[in-house]
Amino acid sequence: LSYYAPQTDVAIELGGEDAKIIYFEGGNVEQRMNGICAGGTGSFIDQMASLIQTDASGLNEFAKDYKAIYPIAARCGVFAKTDIQPLINEGATREDLSASIFQAVVNQTISGLACGKPIRGHVAFLGGPLHFLSELKAAFIRTLNLDEEHTITPDNSHLFAAIGSALNYKKESNTTLSSLIDRL
């Protein structure tokens, strides 16, 4: 990010099985990452999509036409299912359920990782779910009350971890087997 979007104050990155909030303050980097559970990540979104008989991109399309947001727990897929099933039984639309699932991811990420620390300034959105699911990103932008000037969506944001690794790669040096053995 320091190369592609140096104005970034906070990065939110969602992956298939992890979520991160990274604060950039005065040259310091503070990274907060979810623990052992994949609640609020791409795999959570896939699990919830299957409950309403679609996939992640289907959720995204449905969420474009939502009318209401229902509270859904995103901390754990099991708890979320117990919130969603009664809503399905009561006739909640797939549009409303889809937007509610995305809002649950937003709420889990913000409450579980920011833990009260403000997310403000220029915010970058990274990772596959935020790259491919426009309505998930829109839910973050709405919740954080960001304007276009403070929203950073780099090209290839779903590949940013790989791009960062490539930029940090140091040229390989030639080493003999005997020198490696000596180092051990």
Task: Give each language-model segment a name.
Residues A114-T143, P154-H158:
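Glycine-rich phosphate-binding loops at beta-strand->alpha-helix junctions
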Residues Y4, G26-A68, L167-K171:
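Glycine-rich phosphate-binding loop plus the immediately following alpha-helix
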Residues D55-P86, S178-R183:
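Internal, active-site/partner-interface "lid" segment
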Residues I12-G16, R32-G40, S100-F102, L130, ...:
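Active-site nucleophile and cofactor-binding loops and adjacent substrate-binding regions
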Residues L1-I12, K20-E30, I110, A114-C115, ...:
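Conserved phosphate-binding catalytic cores of ATP/NTP-utilizing and phosphoryl-transfer enzymes
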